[in-house]
Amino acid sequence: MYQPDFPTVPFRLGLYPVVDSVAWIERLLEAGVRTIQLRIKDKRDEEVEADVIAAIALGRRYDARLFINDYWRLAIKHRAYGVHLGQEDLETTDLKAIQAAGLRLGVSTHDDMEIDIALAAKPSYIALGHVFPTQTKQMPSAPQGLAQLARHIDRLADYPTVAIGGISVERAPAVLATGVGSIAVVSAITQAADWRAATAQLLDIAGVGDE
């Protein structure tokens, strides 16, 4: 049963781009995206704080669900909509501080054991990946594929879920057919020959999410 320790999110978050700059946040919110994540890696808090502030301000301007990847202290300080954490971050993050601040929490998973760990944290949503091979980041695990994704969805039937990893415009309908609530994309937009067209196509397929 979906009873998170953090504020709830809609079962369907819709198209969920994951991007590494405020410029991309602004472009995609202008294009109609309403769930988005700022993921800047391997920098100190003071190096990314200005970007976090700007991204959160944009999220508010567009009434969007803006998640900050990893930099949970800054997300709390500047009152982001939510935080997204990888498995490796769960043990070193003060989850109670995120909870007390009223921020939503998303957690990445790659297999059944990591789903167990995520469920124990009772986050707002669970991300399932990587579905297909991806060049966006080095992955220690093998792609899960659609059958494995569908099995996880059956297990998490009433939980908001997000599929991520190698999802393209062409693959998106089959991914959503598993019953997953949302799809996260990276290169399908940021490396597209025409990012506006790719975004519009993905919005047609996945929508903007439930209210």
From Swiss-Prot:
Its EC number is 2.5.1.3. It catalyses: 2-[(2R,5Z)-2-carboxy-4-methylthiazol-5(2H)-ylidene]ethyl phosphate + 4-amino-2-methyl-5-(diphosphooxymethyl)pyrimidine + 2 H(+) = thiamine phosphate + CO2 + diphosphate; 2-(2-carboxy-4-methylthiazol-5-yl)ethyl phosphate + 4-amino-2-methyl-5-(diphosphooxymethyl)pyrimidine + 2 H(+) = thiamine phosphate + CO2 + diphosphate; 4-methyl-5-(2-phosphooxyethyl)-thiazole + 4-amino-2-methyl-5-(diphosphooxymethyl)pyrimidine + H(+) = thiamine phosphate + diphosphate. This is Thiamine-phosphate synthase. NCBIfam families: PRK03512.1, thiE. Keywords: Magnesium, Metal-binding, Thiamine biosynthesis, Transferase. Pathway: Cofactor biosynthesis; thiamine diphosphate biosynthesis; thiamine phosphate from 4-amino-2-methyl-5-diphosphomethylpyrimidine and 4-methyl-5-(2-phosphoethyl)-thiazole: step 1/1. InterPro entries: Aldolase_TIM, ThiamineP_synth_sf, ThiamineP_synth_TenI, TMP_synthase. Belongs to the thiamine-phosphate synthase family. GO terms for cellular component: cytoplasm. 4-amino-2-methyl-5-(diphosphooxymethyl)pyrimidine binds at Q37, L38, R39, I40, K41, N69, S108, K137. Signal peptide: none annotated. It is an enzyme of class 2 (transferase). Mg(2+) binds at D70, D89. Pfam families: TMP-TENI. Binds 1 Mg(2+) ion per subunit. Its cofactor is Mg(2+). One of its GO terms (molecular function) is magnesium ion binding. It comes from the Bacteria. 2-[(2R,5Z)-2-carboxy-4-methylthiazol-5(2H)-ylidene]ethyl phosphate binds at T134, Q135, T136, G166, V186, S187. One of its GO terms (biological process) is thiamine biosynthetic process. Condenses 4-methyl-5-(beta-hydroxyethyl)thiazole monophosphate (THZ-P) and 2-methyl-4-amino-5-hydroxymethyl pyrimidine pyrophosphate (HMP-PP) to form thiamine monophosphate (TMP).
